[in-house]
From Swiss-Prot:
Upper lineage: Bacteria, Pseudomonadati, Campylobacterota, Epsilonproteobacteria, Campylobacterales
Species the sequence originates in: Campylobacter curvus (strain 525.92)
GO terms classed as biological process: L-proline biosynthetic process
One of the record's GO cellular component terms: cytoplasm
Catalytic activity: L-glutamate 5-semialdehyde + phosphate + NADP(+) = L-glutamyl 5-phosphate + NADPH + H(+)
Protein's recorded name: Gamma-glutamyl phosphate reductase
Stated family: Belongs to the gamma-glutamyl phosphate reductase family.
Role according to the record: Catalyzes the NADPH-dependent reduction of L-glutamate 5-phosphate into L-glutamate 5-semialdehyde and phosphate. The product spontaneously undergoes cyclization to form 1-pyrroline-5-carboxylate.
Subcellular location as annotated: Cytoplasm
Keywords linked to the UniProt accession: Amino-acid biosynthesis, Cytoplasm, NADP, Oxidoreductase, Proline biosynthesis
EC number(s) given by UniProt: 1.2.1.41
Length: 442
């Protein structure tokens, strides 16, 4: 019998015990796990260092190494997220509605767990703790399958969760890690419809496409984040630059960082000039139309000449690094690309109508924003952009379960069925009807 089959059977068997686990016991487990994360911070970092060294030797990109790293701040954030989940009201058994049938039967709709969750994810070891905490709070068992790059970190974190949880009644098998790093293990796991109720992939496009195309289990797709920010002509330029800077540079390897900025044609050169000055270390890939417009206004641009931006303290260099950004002419393939690095595509549009149309056809329907002071344009954008999260005058970096008050997330769903956006405890439940009668027949 395979490792995964044993894990899946044990997870399914734990579901009934999880239903009987009290809200108090769940909170005790989660608070104890949070305390243990902080107490064992150095041991966690030591396990993580093994993964980081292996990743460096394997030539992982800076973006992937950033996702992989567990710093003091990230471990503290994990612990705080678990504590937040522990504070949530109990959702299992929540009454969602009810009515009396004409024949006297009482019909009640209640919230129940999904069952066994299968989480397949890449790089980020914090997902192990986030997923386990949210699964427990929502009454679900969870099978975790992380990447080979994070195997030491994931083993340590899942063992910590289980050893701590067992002291307070966590059922055996309720939180499990598939330790096999063979790709065949994923292929086996995604066909176990008898034991696993839903799959939630978190990773790159290739992983998600493989699971969607081959799974025999329902999948909640957590899509890539090709996030856009549209700067309207009425936007406060200084504020817009600060928001874009945050959305691109705070943590560029995340799915909620901005990948493309659309500039209203009437303010495009002004905003691009400010971005070029302020976004240190960022490569701005400028669409050819805006590239020409920029050159017409500020002097001829050449791949080996400096563009002296009059009235600015900084000098922006075309095609090479400077104290500000690096400007290069974009290829069409740059638009619609998730860079996950300090690269930003920039394009100008005629107004909000073109911005909406462009985003709906080029984004991954994750998180998109408008920066504007025009109420009508803001409302048009928020209503028409078909994404899981839409913003007015705020950074896309807030698309996060913790920031939304969920205490972490199982993923950010970009599909429309079962859940959409950051998925917290409630999104990991479904419903059932309880009908109480007194001998009624039809």
């Amino acid at each position: 019998m395979s490792e995964i089959l044993n894990i899946a059977k044990a997870a399914k068997a734990s579901c009934e015990q999880l239903l009987n686990l009290s809200a108090q016991a769940k909170s005790q487990i989660l608070n104890a796990v949070a305390d243990e994360l902080v107490r064992q911070k150095e041991a966690i970092k030591a396990a993580n260092l093994l993964d980081l060294k292996a990743g460096e030797n394997a030539g992982l990109s800076a973006a992937l190494l950033d996702r992989l790293e567990l710093t003091d701040a990230r471990i503290e954030a994990m612990a705080n997220g678990v504590r937040e989940v522990a504070k949530f009201d109990e959702v299992v058994g929540e009454v969602l509605g009810g009515w009396r049938h004409p024949n006297g039967m009482q019909i009640t709709k209640i919230r129940v767990p999904l069952g066994v969750l299968g989480i397949i994810y890449e790089s980020r070891p914090n997902v192990s703790i986030d997923a386990a905490a949210l699964a427990l709070k929502s009454g679900n068992a969870v099978i975790l399958r992380g990447s080979a790059a994070a195997i030491s970190s994931n083993k340590f974190l899942v063992n910590l969760f289980n050893e701590t949880g067992a002291k307070f009644g966590l059922p055996k098998g309720a939180v499990a890690l598939v330790e096999s790093t063979d790709k065949e293990a994923v292929g086996e796991m995604i066909k176990m419809h008898e034991f696993i109720d839903v799959l939630i992939p978190r990773g790159g496009k290739n992983l998600k496409d493989f699971i969607i195309q081959n799974a025999t289990i329902p999948v909640i797709e957590t899509g890539a984040g090709v996030c856009h920010i549209f700067v309207d002509e009425s936007a406060d330029v200084r504020e817009a630059v600060e928001i874009i800077k945050n959305a691109k540079t705070q943590r560029p390897s995340t799915c909620n960082s901005v990948e493309c900025v659309l500039l209203h044609e009437r303010v495009a050169v002004k905003v691009l000039t400010s971005l070029a000055r302020e976004l240190d270390g960022v490569q701005l890939r400028v669409h050819e139309d805006l590239w020409a417009k920029f050159g017409e206004n500020l002097g001829e641009i050449s791949g080996d000449l400096d563009a002296n931006l009059s009235g600015l303290k900084a000098e922006v260099k075309i095609g090479e690094s400077s104290n500000g950004a690096q400007l290069v002419k974009a290829d069409e393939s740059d638009f619609g690309t998730e860079f996950l690095s300090l690269v930003l595509a920039v394009k100008c549009v005629s107004g909000v109508a073109e911005a909406v149309s462009y985003i709906n056809s080029h984004s991954t329907h994750h998180s998109d924003a408008i920066l504007s002071r025009d109420y009508a344009n803001i409302e048009r954008f928020l209503n028409a952009v078909d994404s899981a999260v839409v913003y007015a005058n705020a950074s896309t970096r807030f698309s996060d379960g913790g920031e939304f008050g969920f205490g972490g997330e199982i993923g950010i769903s970009t599909q429309k069925l079962h859940a959409r956006g950051p998925m917290g405890v409630r999104e990991l439940t479904t419903s059932k009807y309880v009908v109480r009668g007194d001998g009624q027949i039809r």
